[in-house]
Amino acid sequence: MRDRLMLLSGWAFGPAALEPLAELLRERGPHLQVDIVSLPTLGDPDAWLDELDARLPADRWLAGWSLGGMLATQLAARRGDACNGLITLCSNPCFRSRDDWPAAMPAEVFEAFHAAFRLGPEETRKRFSLLASRGGFDARTLARQLEVSRLECPVAALDAGLQLLAALDGREAMRRFVGPQLHLFAGNDALVPAAAAQALLDWLPDVEVDVIENASHALPLERAEDIATAMLAFMQRGEED
């Protein structure tokens, strides 16, 4: 079904953060069925991809925000022709920097954040909302909107999500998936540096990559209209190919 899209949420946030984008996609693409998918709430990070694969129907477009995009990438590579195309929003192939992928959050910054989360999950989640909204036009309002959309789930599941953010490397999955790919980044993102866009394009020049300037990591919430326009145009091109 080429008119169906599964939209995966980001770490610690529920469907509400993606609902404005989903509504615009439905309004502007009346034949498009859009389903927002919450991330797994399992304490075992190794089980997340299998859980998503079992829960999400095949023959859909896969899209995701941040960690959701990283997982959508892995799932697209696993499904191959059973995935119509891949769209990621503020998703770095490697969220934490590596020697061969420096365009990411410095490893020591990530480790400090993860340690802080284990000591004080509630305070760290609030800090994450502030970081996700930093660089936006109205960061304070964005942070409040993100707080309202927080996913209520076990701390162990949130910790598993952080483990995945540290461990996942989507480069090989992107290379293996031969369907259409669109990767959108935010120019003022405080969590995924905009430099990752050029790094990705240099590494995999056959995919579509763009940077939405003057936008924060909360890209699908802050710039829903721009993202909906870009996604629908990309999907239309994919169906024409």
Predicted regions and their residues:
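Acidic beta-to-alpha connecting loop that harbors the catalytic carboxylate
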Residues: W11, G187-D189, N214-S216
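Flexible "cap/lid" loop of the alpha/beta hydrolase fold
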Residues: C83-A116, A157-A160
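Conserved HGGG/HGGXW glycine-rich cap/lid loop of the alpha/beta-hydrolase fold
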Residues: M1-D46
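Conserved alpha/beta-hydrolase catalytic His-Asp/Glu region
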Residues: L119-A173
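Short beta-strand/loop motif that positions the catalytic acidic residue
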Residues: F177, H183-F185, D189
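Gly/Ala-rich beta-loop-alpha elbow adjacent to hydrolase catalytic centers
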Residues: G64-G68, A72
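Conserved alpha/beta-hydrolase "acid-adjacent" motif
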Residues: A190-A196
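Catalytic histidine-centered segment of alpha/beta-hydrolase-like enzymes
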Residues: A215-A228
